[in-house]
Amino acid sequence: MMTPEFFMEIEKKTFSPYAQLTSASKGRERPEETSPVRTAYQRDRDRIIHSKSFRRLMHKTQVFLSPVDEHYRTRMTHTLEVTQIARIVARALRLNEDLTEAIALGHDLGHTPFGHAGEEALRTCYDPTFRHAKQSLRVVDRLENDGEGLNLTFEVRDGILNHSGKALAATLEGRIVKFADRIAYINSDIDDAIRGGILSLSDIPSDLLEILGEGYSERINRMVLSLVEGSTDKNEIVMTEPVGEATERLRAFLTDRVYINSAAKSEEHKAKDLLVSLYGYYIDRPDELPPLYRRIAEEDGIKTSVADFISCMTDRYAVDLFRRLFIPDVWRGGAV
């Protein structure tokens, strides 16, 4: 039988000197018995995959709000794309693929319904510093497993928290996920924007297409190769130039043309208003919260509890709940 000790010996013999060894993990906040067949990071990965928050990602917006066309990305498909890219890079660099996979699978667990519109709604009504990365950590630490949390290792928790923004993860594996996230959403969002008629390939600056490629697969391959070449035998994760600079310019282009000013964003104000209304409703009626969130309200405060409840909703659940709470139902009484 291949035991965790067997895998950890292989790590010591084959991994890069810059890799995070499983045997060197800082461990969990609550000590546990070890598994006879899985390493700590493999167990973290499995806990995330089997969590309710992970399953809900399939019904959360990536860019397009609740699209009718089922070919548009969701938070779930985005997460799987990030995971695939991150694993390729980690393997090529001889880093810890299990750790990388666990971070990638968990990085968006705390994302709100309606994508970044939901995040902005909670910044408005709850906390100006609300970030989905911080909420993702709260999900795995506090909300999952009926309020007990998943008790993940320090390195996975750190990678989830620091997958976005300026802060760097403590491990190279966590830093890979930050780049994989960008590579995935840049290219999938272009693909979805073209599908939705919001963007055409000719709209993208020609010099960027020349550097990065015109096709979806070509761009991903060039970005991944740039990341691997720039990071090989180094204690950092970086892209080579000119691909790195072109990637950032392409991201800025998408921010202006898709994320802020496109027709896909025309309904976002409704999504924000919907979530703000739900937040206000439950702030005034905490007794109507589900049992878990009533308990959290007693321990962490009502504002935090309501924000937790809302951030865990799917797009569909939020819309249905709003309709039930605020839209009068049709009278179905008998005829006079």
At which residue positions do the language-model features occur?
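Aspartate-rich (DDxxD/NDxxD/DxxxD) Mg2+/diphosphate-binding motifs
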Residues: 98-125
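Histidine-centered, transition-metal-coordinating active-site segments
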Residues: 1-75, 79, 83-89, 96-97, ...
